[in-house]
Amino acid sequence: MRFLLGTNTVIGLLGGNAGVLAGVRRYVPQDFGIPAIAAHELFYGAYRSARRAQNLALLDGLPLAVLEFDKEDARQAGEIRAALAAAGMPIGPYDVLIAGQARARGLVLVTHNVGEFARVSGLQVEDWQS
């Protein structure tokens, strides 16, 4: 695994965003994972949508691994949160968990939310959305 796909990147993938599709096509499905936190956000959105059944089916059909959040992910997220709070530059609670998981596992986070994640030291971030 090389890449962790953020929530907005998965939405872009499902929605046919040309940049995301081009990025994904350069690799194999085993190169990608979805953070459990992002999966939660995606399922929440699906359950709140007018097209609930269709969106749930899309999510259930994704051939990508969902990465469970473990102790080292939590440790990294805690360190990131403390550092950003001390610097007066906090990021959202879900984003800090996703950042912790990506950094703990040495994965590149693919997200359109670069401004938020760029504050995290040692985190590799790419934006594939067009």
Regions found by a protein language model. Give the residues of each.
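Short, well-structured N-terminal submotif of metal-dependent ribonuclease cores
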Residues: 1-34, 44-61
